[in-house]
Amino acid sequence: MLSKRWDTAGRWCIYALLLIVFVGPFWGIVATAFSGAPVKPGELLAWPHQFSLENFIFAWMDIGVWQYLLNSILVVFFGTVLQVSVSALAAYALARKKFRGVALVSLVILSTMMLPEEVIAISLYMIINWRLPLIDASLYNSYLGMILPVVGWAFSIFVLTEFMSAIPKELEEAARIDGANEWQIFFHVILPLVKPALGTVVTFGFIMIWDQYLLPLIVVNQDSLNTIPVILGTLRTDESITPNIFIAITLLAMLPSIIVYLGLQKHFNRGIMSGAVKG
C-alpha cells in the first residue's frame, strides 16, 4: 500500500516537472509581455510586476504591428487555401489516376523536400523579378510574390496522396455507376474521406506560411508589405524596443497559430493517428 502511494506521488512529481518544463517558457512570455516593469531572468515564472497593457498598446499603435499582422493574415489565408486546393488535386491525380510517368512525377515532387530554402533563394529572386508580359510587371513587392511560391508544397501533396491511395476503389466505381462525374467523385467521395488529412495539411501549411521569414525578405522591400516574422527580425536589433515590448509583439505573433491549432486539433490528431496506424 505504501509503495503504491510512493508510486503515485512519484508519478505526479514527474507530471509537475513536465508541466513546468513545457508551460514555464510560455508563462514567462506572458508574464514579460504584461509586465509594466523590466523582468529579470529569475522572475520569469513570477506574476507580472505592475500588470499593464502598455506594451501591447505601444506595439499596436506606435509600431503599427496591426498592419504586419494583417499582411501575414492575408498571405497565410490565400496561401493556405491555394496550397490545400492544389495539393488535393495533385494528390488525387497521383493516387487515383494511372498514367505514364506517375512514379517519376512523384519522385520529382518529393525531391523538392530535400532542398532547403537557402539553396533556391537566388533562383526564386530571379523568377519573382521577371516582368510578366501581359501586365508588364513583376511579382516583386506584392502579395502574390509571397503567396505563389508556397502554393506547391510537397509535404501536403505527399500526405494527401498517401491517404487517397488507401481509399478502396470500389467506392469510386460505385459512384461512377451511379452517374457521378470526375469532379463529383473528387468533392463528394474522396475529400470527405480524407478530412483528417486535410486538417493535418491545413495546420502544418498555416504554420509553415505564417513562420516564413526568408521568402518575404527576398521578395519584399517595402515596409508596408512586411509580415510579422520579418518585423520581429528587424525589431530584435532595435535598441529603442524594450524586451517587454518585443515579447508582447512575439505573443501577438503566436496567437493566430495557437488559435488555428486549437480549432483544427480534432482533425489534426485524427490525421496523425491515422497515419501512424497506416504506417
Indicate where each model-derived feature is located.
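A structural signal for multi-pass alpha-helical bundles of membrane permease subunits
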Residues: L2-G279
